[in-house]
Swiss-Prot record:
Organism: Carboxydothermus hydrogenoformans (strain ATCC BAA-161 / DSM 6008 / Z-2901)
Full protein name: 2-C-methyl-D-erythritol 2,4-cyclodiphosphate synthase
The protein's enzyme class: lyase
Record site: Transition state stabilizer: H36, T135
Self-association and partners: Homotrimer.
Pfam family, one: YgbB
Leader sequence segment: none
Residues given in the record as 4-CDP-2-C-methyl-D-erythritol 2-phosphate binding sites: 10-12, 36-37, 58-60, 63-67, 134-137, 141, 144
Length: 163
């Protein structure tokens, strides 16, 4: 059985007047992430990790930010399309490990719901999904509360027809 690994990273600036959506969860906060879509930084990092695992380019190539079809789109739909392409090539998720980097807000109360959302979107057991959050102890753009970043590492495994 062939196993492949993918790594993804995404970052968006925090701005006033936008909802903060991470991992498909709307999080109460005074600012939200700026982006062409709903700017779900976690879903974007995971999508790039999937694409990287099979050398399929990146999320910006598939869903360009100058294409009006994707303005304000739910990033869960983008992630589902990316995963459909992974499945179409004979692979499925083995496991996912992701980290969200944000000084504020505190994300721990929302992590379980993010994991549940991902398990449903990716049609997998929640045990295959790890999502964590950390701060930068006040350092850098995240520490200054200028933006939020996410990193994701995934492994995909070849789907065997007879086994």
């Amino acid at each position: 059985m062939m196993i492949r690994i993918g790594f993804g990273y995404d970052v968006h600036p925090l701005v006033e007047g936008r909802k903060l959506i991470i991992g498909g969860v709307e999080i109460p906060f005074t600012k939200g992430l700026l982006g062409h879509s709903d700017a779900d930084v976690l879903y974007h990092a995971i999508a790039d990790a999937f694409l990287g695992s099979l050398a399929l380019g990146d999320i910006g190539q598939l869903f360009p930010d100058n294409d009006e079809r994707y303005r304000g789109i739910d990033s869960g739909l983008l992630l589902q399309e990316v995963y459909r392409r992974v499945r179409e090539r004979g692979y499925c998720l083995n496991n996912l490990d992701a980290v969200i980097v944000a000084q504020k807000p505190k994300l721990l109360p929302f992590i379980q719901k993010m994991r549940e959302n991902l398990a449903v979107l990716l049609n997998t057991a929640i045990e295959n999904i790890s999502v964590k959050a950390t701060t930068t102890e006040g350092l850098g753009f995240a520490g200054r509360e200028e933006g939020i970043a996410a990193y994701a590492v995934i492994t995909v495994k070849e789907v065997l027809e007879n086994g």
